[in-house]
Amino acid sequence: MALSAYFLLCLSVLGLDAIYGFGFRNGFLELMANSYRERKLSGTAEPLQGNITGTGLDELLGNLIVFYWPVLDGNHPGLSLQAFHFLGAIVAVWVAIQVQSWRSPNRNSLLRSPTLFAMLSQVVAIAVIVPLWCAISIWSSSSPRPITRAVSASAAHSIRLIPISMVLGFGIPTIGMLLPESTHQNLFSKQIAIAVWQIWPIYVALWHWGLRVLFRSRLKEGISVRTACRTACSFAFVCAIIPHAVSWGLSLTLIPTNLLADVLPWQFAGGGTVQVQSMAQGGLWFLQWDHLIGMGSFLLWAMHMRWTVEQQSSFLQTCYLALKVGVLCLISGPCGAAVWLLWEESQF
């Protein structure tokens, strides 16, 4: 058990180097810093809004706007496609983490605060925070019981509200950020929309709290814990599989060589000679490594949970599980495979 947790901690350190160490060595972080200092968005003549909150947070928000601008401006299809692919996995993994936070043994632990981890992932990187959360989850697990046996009946109502709170708290700010600026320029700018989106975990938490208060009268009604958990799991799996299938389908069927070349190769994070040619290229490598390490870690955690429940698996069962994971990764990506495994073994 401890070995899996230590391995996940190593992946968190690897994520830190793949994101920031590699970004420093290939010049991406320097490009971001220069763009922020010049108060100009990369590749455009549009000035960077430097006074959004009037506090020290403006420097952080300014750098985040610089990063996300090429993702959203529509001029870099490979980068936008990777972001779309990643977006579904982000929703799926945080739905799963929220469900896990309602496990009875974790109610008074650090894992009870998924909003904190989600905000840290926004500021640091998913490749750093998700492996860290997975390691803490393994250390704090008091029993191998499936989650449907560990969740109280009252908590099942809260779990049932997680998909709705994600749609409202994550979906609405995301739509506002993705819409062309011409559709809302009289209300707010694209840069403001990017800044507002950054704290989506807080919106999700507020929506979830509000819905729980609103539907408090229904808490006494009977609800199947398994039904609530599987509903949340099904929502997470759909969020993972659709962007995965669409992004890879477009890459493999439309066959624009420049787009396919952007999506397929993985630049080695340890290489010190490769240099980014633009903010878009650096952002693509950033998202690729963030996606790979973050979601790969989550899959390893899900497999650990599966093996913990099935403590007497035979060699053939282990081979079958490995084959199943491979097929699921092809169909839905590593995050979708993790969600499926957890749902299948009633971990949700």
Curated annotation (Swiss-Prot):
Belongs to the membrane-bound ascI terpene cyclase family. It is a multi-pass membrane protein. Keywords: Glycoprotein, Isomerase, Membrane, Transmembrane, Transmembrane helix. Glycans are attached at N51. GO terms for molecular function: isomerase activity. GO terms for cellular component: membrane. It is found in: Membrane. The chain crosses the membrane at residues 2-22, 77-97, 116-136, 161-181, 191-211, 235-255, 283-303, 323-343. Its EC number is 5.4.99.-. Citreoviridin inhibits mitochondrial oxidative phosphorylation by binding to the beta-subunit of F1-ATPase. Ectopic mitochondrial ATP synthase is a factor that mediates HIV-1 transfer between antigen-presenting cells (APCs) and CD4+ target cells, and citreoviridin can completely block antigen-presenting cell (APC)-mediated transfer of HIV-1 at the APC-target cells. Inhibition of Ectopic mitochondrial ATP synthase by citreoviridin can also lead to suppression of cancer growth by activating the unfolded protein response. Pathway: Mycotoxin biosynthesis. Hydrolase; part of the gene cluster that mediates the biosynthesis of citreoviridin, an inhibitor of the of F1-ATPase beta-subunit. The HR-PKS ctvA accepts acetyl-CoA as the starter unit and catalyzes eight iterations of malonyl-CoA extension and four iterations of SAM-dependent methylation at C4, C12, C14, and C16. The KR and DH domains selectively act on the first six iterations to generate the hexaene chain. This is Terpene cyclase ctvD. Its main location: membrane. It comes from the Eukaryota.
